[in-house]
Amino acid sequence: MAKVCYFTGRKTVSGNNRSHAMNKTKRVVKPNLQKVTVLIDGKPKKVWASARALKSGKVERV
């Protein structure tokens, strides 16, 4: 299972760190994903959910 939020689709994104001299190094920004158990089609299932989805009430835990 990929580390992508089941509800919002948030996932890892890549970019660059830029120093004062504008040198660049690759970096990744990872979302705050939590493994939660939710009801999907009436059955409990473990999925990745972002902290933002949990806080906003988009997730109904079991």
Curated annotation (Swiss-Prot):
UniProt superkingdom: Bacteria
SUPFAM superfamilies in the cross-refs: L28p-like
GO cellular component: ribonucleoprotein complex; ribosome
Record's keyword terms, sorted: Ribonucleoprotein, Ribosomal protein
InterPro entries for the chain: Bacterial_rp_bL28, Ribosomal_bL28, Ribosomal_bL28/bL31-like_sf, Ribosomal_bL28_bact-type, Ribosomal_bL28_sf
GO biological process: translation
Coiled-coil residue spans: none
One of the record's GO molecular function terms: structural constituent of ribosome
Pfam families recorded: Ribosomal_L28
PANTHER family for this protein: 50S RIBOSOMAL PROTEIN L28, LARGE RIBOSOMAL SUBUNIT PROTEIN BL28A
HAMAP family to which the protein is assigned, alphabetical: Ribosomal_bL28
NCBIfam families in the record: L28 (TIGR00009)
Family from the record: Belongs to the bacterial ribosomal protein bL28 family.
Protein name (database record): Large ribosomal subunit protein bL28
Species annotation: Streptococcus thermophilus (strain ATCC BAA-250 / LMG 18311)
Primary gene name: rpmB
